[in-house]
Each structure stands twice: as C-alpha cells, then as structure tokens.
Amino acid sequence: MANGRVVQVMGPVVDVEFDRGHLPAIYNAIKIQHKAQSAGERDIDLTVEVATHLGDNLVRTVAMSSTDGLVRGMEAVDTGAAISVPVGAITLGRVFNVLGEPIDLQELGQVDRRDPIHRKAPEFVDQATTVEILETGIKVIDLLAPYIKGGKIGLFGGAGVGKTVTIQELINNIAQEHGGISVFAGVGERTREGNDLYHEMKDAGVLPKTAMVFGQMNEPPGARLRVALTGLTMAEYFRDEEGRDVLLFVDNIFRFTQAGSEVSALLGRMPSAVGYQPTLATEMGQLQERITSTKKGSVTSIQAIYVPADDYTDPAPATTFAHLDATTNLERSIAELGIFPAVDPLASTSRALAPDIVGQEHYDVARSVQKILQRYKELQDIIAILGMDELSDDDKQVVGRARRIQRFLSQSFHVAEQFTGNPGQYVPLKETVRSFKEILEGKHDHLPEGAFLYVGTIEEAVEKAKKMA
C-alpha cells in the first residue's frame, strides 16, 4: 500500500501526490484519515476514488463524502483496490451508504465477503435468451406495458406525478406476492423520502427481503455517481452466487447522470450537449449492461427517470431510453384528472407486448383498449368545440367505453393506504385481462363511470355501482 499526501482540495475533488512508481490505478480507493489535534477540529475519515492521472505523480480523485476540514499535506493511503461493499444475506434488512457502511445505527457484524463496485458485465454466452413476464399486480402495467424478468424498465415522469409511490408499490407487491429479494438504490433523491420508505417497508414487513443503499441529495457528487453501482453489486451477488431473481430499484437514474455531469465539470472535461458530460453514453452503458438475466438468475431493474421540464428530448432521459425493455410514462394531465397511477396508456410501451410472449388474448385486449383510448383522444377536440351531441352513435359508445376504461385503469395502492383511506389492491394478470375484455364487449356500458374508479376487478365495479344506485 502506497502512501501519498494531499496537495490540492477543490470542493469534492482532491489532488494527491504519490512517490514515483507508486501511482494508484484508476478507480482505486484512497483513504485519508486524520485524528483531531485540537478542540475545534474534527476527526477525518474520508474515502476518495482515483479519477484521472495528471502526470508528475499526481492523481485527481473524487470524494465519497464531505471534504470539510481537509488540508494540504494530510497523509493519503492507497488501498490497492476499488471500493468494495458487503454482499450476501448480511445486507438484507439493512441501510448502507455508497461505501457499504451501515447508516441505520445498528452494528453490521461479521462480513464474510466484499465485492468491488466496478465489474464487467456478464459475457454473452452467460446471458439468458428466454423472455418471461413479471406480474406486478398493477392493472395498467400488466395489461399495456408488461415487465420482463431480467429486463430494464423506465418509470418516466416530471416532478410530483407519482414515480416514487409507484416504485414503493412495486417493491411491496413483489415482496408480498413473489417473496423476491429487492435492492433499493436511492440516488440523489430526498432524504425524507428514503426515511419514509424505510419505515413503510418496516411496517409492511418487507424490509427483511430488501437491501437499501442511499446517496442522497445532500451528498457530494462522487457518492451520488457511485451509489447505483453499490446497489447493483449487492444485487449481482444474489443473482450470480445464489441464483435468485432480484429486483433492483433505482430512484432516480437522472440523478446518476446529473452527478456524472457535476464530476465531469469538476475534473475539467469539456461539456457536451446541454452541458452534460461527454462520457454520458459510456457511463450509462457501463451501468445498464450489468443489469441482465443470466442462466443462473436475473436482475430486473425498475428505474425512476426524472424528465427535466417534461422534455423527453433532453440527453439524460434520451440516453436512458436506448437501454430499456419497457417504459411506464406517468402523465401530469392524467394525474390532474385524479386518476392514479397516472400512467399514460398510449405512451407507455413494452417489447413484451407481443402475441408469442403474452398470448393472443392478452395482446388483442391490450391493443383494443389502446385503440379505443386513441379514438377518444382524437374525438376530444370535437367534443370540446361542439359537445357530445354532435357525435355519431358509434362515437358516443366509444367515448363512453373509453371513459370507463380510463377510470378502470386507476387502482388503490397498499403504500398509499394511510393517505387515501382505501385498502390497496393486487390484481392478478388473468383477472385484469378478463375484466377489460368484458368492458370492451359492452357488458358494463350501463354502469356509471364513477363505479370504475379505484376498484380492483370488474366484480368490484359492479358492487360499487349497486351502492351508488
């Protein structure tokens, strides 16, 4: 292990000088530790990661926590390896930071194995080639944009349309119905939300099946850039060593890009389009290519994607799009109608929505639902100008069914029970397809539209209509 010394501190970027022939490799972790000498000082225990070699035996590093109190001349020790984090059963039910240190005020105990956060993606020969659907119990997702085991799913939406709540519901449903292991990576989001999620999962009893890793908004960009890799490394262990199907939740993948942009600017790289880092596509690819199904198990990733100013052409969401198997688009106009989850049934897509994967019946029902909703969208201008009376009888029927379908796509969430007062619903895929098929066939045209709002199956809508009568 080589020793060096700090020669320059620029916010979260630290330059360290080493002796000739002892330069640490790129991605190596370097420890800077210093005991307080006087009452006003604080102990320093900082890990930095090597980002570039500057020449003249200097390396430029990025700090994983605050650099407050750091001064030139402090000793820095090269650990000789990349940042390594605990993996395995010891991580379940616990909350970690980017370095794999517990932040839930409990002792970690004996760590049997640590894995480096920088690893290669699985080889092509190791990857699985079959496509299997992952049932979520959320009607609009299962019907119109089904998720794939081992796939990458993007949850798109602007501020405040329900990305985090939808992610919380998915964690809950997968844990309760499938008994699956989840890893949650909180990347650059609100600490309050992370705290709420921890307590909600504890109360719901799903925490023992979940590992949580946080690098939140208040942390330096180095931590926010690497925390997604920490979570992914924990998930990969369960896939590769235990052959499990793991869910990796990333909230929010945009903050990963944003942190990369900050680090890139601090390292002095020339910015690219809209001020993003020139290495945007490479960084995203290195993360996303590790998320896949192998012959042993799978890592299915659900990533919340903040869309800056609702602009889908922004380089950050646009780069992420290229890696996704399914997209769930949350739309503000649907949220304003009071319909949650506010999923846009026409903009959300999945490559699994094909007859040879989901079956002919499911495919036909899903496409018919989209066809009716698309026709309703086209008629809205006419309705706004001339009113419903000017429509043909066929179009009036389409509008009536579309409005019922639109409301039936809403659903009460388990994680929102305390706010809404409505018990959450998990709707099996078979029930979802059957219920929508009945609406399409016109069996329930006589029921009031309000009966379809926040119910699970079609039978619940019929019961609700009786109560409303």
Swiss-Prot record:
Compartments, as annotated in UniProt: Cell membrane
Give the SMART domains listed for this entry. AAA (SM00382)
> Which catalytic reaction applies to this protein?
ATP + H2O + 4 H(+)(in) = ADP + phosphate + 5 H(+)(out)
A Pfam family per the record: ATP-synt_VA_C
Its subunit composition reads: F-type ATPases have 2 components, CF(1) - the catalytic core - and CF(0) - the membrane proton channel. CF(1) has five subunits: alpha(3), beta(3), gamma(1), delta(1), epsilon(1). CF(0) has three main subunits: a(1), b(2) and c(9-12). The alpha and beta chains form an alternating ring which encloses part of the gamma chain. CF(1) is attached to CF(0) by a central stalk formed by the gamma and epsilon chains, while a peripheral stalk is formed by the delta and b chains.
Locate the residues binding ATP: 157-164
At the top of the EC hierarchy, this enzyme's class is translocase
Known function? Produces ATP from ADP in the presence of a proton gradient across the membrane. The catalytic sites are hosted primarily by the beta subunits.
Q: What is the lineage of its organism?
A: Bacteria, Bacillati, Bacillota, Bacilli, Bacillales
Family assignment from sequence similarity:
Belongs to the ATPase alpha/beta chains family.
As for membrane topology, the entry says: Peripheral membrane protein
Entry's Gene Ontology cellular component terms: plasma membrane; proton-transporting ATP synthase complex
Keywords for this protein: ATP synthesis, ATP-binding, Cell membrane, CF(1), Hydrogen ion transport, Ion transport, Membrane, Nucleotide-binding, Translocase, Transport
* Entries under HAMAP family matching the protein: ATP_synth_beta_bact (MF_01347)
Q: Which cysteines are joined by disulfide bonds?
A: none
Q: Which gene encodes it?
A: atpD
Q: Which InterPro entries match?
A: AAA+_ATPase, ATP-synt_VA_C, ATP_synth_F1_bsu, ATPase_a/bsu_AS, ATPase_alpha/beta_chains, ATPase_F1/V1/A1_a/bsu_N, ATPase_F1/V1/A1_a/bsu_N_sf, ATPase_F1/V1/A1_a/bsu_nucl-bd
This protein's major location comes to: membrane
Report the CDD domains cross-referenced here.
ATP-synt_F1_beta_C, ATP-synt_F1_beta_N, F1-ATPase_beta_CD
Specify the protein name.
Answer: ATP synthase subunit beta
GO molecular function (one): proton-transporting ATP synthase activity, rotational mechanism
User: Could you tell me the EC number(s) of this protein?
Assistant: 7.1.2.2
